[in-house]
Amino acid sequence: MREKFTGSETVEVLYTIGEQDRIAGITGYTVRPPEARKEKPKVYAFTSGDIDKILAVKPDLVLTFSDLQADIARDLINAGVPVYAFNQRSIDETLGMVETIGRLVGAEDKALRMVAELEAQIAAAKGLAAARIARSGRRPRVYFEEWDEPNITAVRWVSELIEIAGGENIFADRAASPLARDRILADPLEVVARAPDVIIGSWCGKHFRPERVSARPGWSTVPAVVHGRLHEIKSAIILTPGPVAISEGLPLLLDILDIEAR
């Protein structure tokens, strides 16, 4: 079976479980693992491109992600190509995605081992966070910003990772919405009112600018700004709903919150 995988998350899983030879093509936005960009043909962008390039690699199955690729899925189905659409938005759903990929390619045992390793990392992080909370007696309040204009707060899996790492997402009430538009702050002063101890920026596609955040009108009294507690985590790590958010994003969150607890 030759699969064509459209998302970086699915490509990462296939490489990790040793099934990369099944990959017939990737999107131009695939970044993990780095060797995929060298070894696999790029046959599509993420939401646009020439569907004939996908058909040219003769895939037996195409994996897509979310409503963002609904048009691609429709066109492929109309062309007679089987499509499996993922829509993972939480840590549990991400682990389920790994398991499902394993079943789809006949490598369920290897996928389950990968899930077990990720679950072990989560358990270890919870233990470290619990020890820190026991010492300090508190969870740092975190404002996570995934875009600056307008201000967009953390998506669900990021909010969950913040909690696992021992923090408190100050906009956890918004995190359940899969749509970014539902996580836009109508008034940036909402951040001031919720007084985060730590600000973490992950502006998708561009560098986080802490000096710009600190200079926002009315933000000078925010504890994170007063104490210079502004950090960046690269969007390719933390805003990817795949294994990398757990294996690399979670340790970075732990490190940031460890620093702020000292």
Predicted regions and their residues:
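N-terminal ligand-binding lobe of clamshell/alpha-beta domains
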Residues: 1-262
